């Protein structure tokens, strides 16, 4: 909460005023806390090769919303691992080839649908971190959160090797999402 000069929460209309803000002094002086593992570059080269071995195929593109400004599609794209890339792709109406900037949104780690984002001045792709279905009922996400995805990043067994870490495939889905988005014919080819 925002504080008054007296250290009390500032209010407006009887409610605390809250906002987020970050800052840093000499951020360029920040140093890495631990060194990269000796095989870091070799490991990621191997992971990128595995990703490249799976052709980036559009598995599903379903129109879920049409507004005055945009078409919104629920898309799924092939990827390594057990889940595809999933997300909402919003393309402004009347977009011509190479006419628009691109914004890719990586939507945190919560077990939920990616949000629909519409902007008539850009292509927007909201990527679901888990590659799960979007736009489903709350019970679907609760079941995943309490079951299969419960403590997904904190499981000791899954974190014994980098290959079995949950975040390995999450990162590869994010990279595939970017690869897909950059292949869209409406993207201007430079503004990302």
Predicted features along the sequence, with ranges:
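Beta-strand-enriched, solvent-exposed domains that form extended recognition/catalytic surfaces
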Residues: 1-30
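Non-catalytic propeptide/linker segments at domain boundaries
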Residues: 25-41, 47-49
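N-terminal cap/lid segment of alpha/beta-hydrolase-fold proteins
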Residues: 38-41, 49-98
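Short beta->alpha connector loops
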Residues: 83, 106-111
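The conserved beta1-alpha1 loop
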Residues: 90, 101, 106-107, 128
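Alpha/beta-hydrolase fold active-site loops
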Residues: 101, 122, 191
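Cap/lid segment of the alpha/beta-hydrolase catalytic domain
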Residues: 110-180, 184
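Alpha/beta-hydrolase fold nucleophile elbow
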Residues: 185-192
């Amino acid at each position: 909460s925002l504080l008054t000069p007296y250290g009390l929460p500032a209010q407006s209309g009887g409610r605390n005023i809250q906002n987020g803000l970050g800052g840093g002094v000499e951020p360029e002086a920040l140093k890495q806390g631990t060194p990269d593992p000796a095989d870091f570059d070799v490991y990621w080269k191997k992971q990128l090769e595995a990703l490249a071995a799976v052709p980036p195929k559009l598995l599903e593109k379903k129109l879920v919303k049409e507004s005055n400004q945009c078409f919104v599609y629920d898309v799924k794209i092939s990827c390594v691992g057990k889940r595809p890339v999933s997300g909402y792709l919003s393309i402004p109406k009347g977009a011509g080839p190479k006419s628009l900037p691109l914004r890719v949104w990586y939507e945190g780690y919560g077990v939920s649908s990616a949000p629909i984002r519409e902007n008539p001045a850009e292509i927007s792709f909201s990527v679901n971190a888990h590659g799960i279905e979007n736009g489903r009922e709350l019970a679907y996400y609760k079941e995943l959160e309490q079951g299969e995805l419960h403590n997904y990043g904190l499981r000791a067994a899954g974190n014994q090797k980098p290959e079995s870490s949950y975040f390995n495939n999450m990162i590869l889905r994010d990279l595939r999402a970017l690869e897909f988005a950059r292949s869209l014919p409406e993207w201007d080819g430079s503004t990302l």
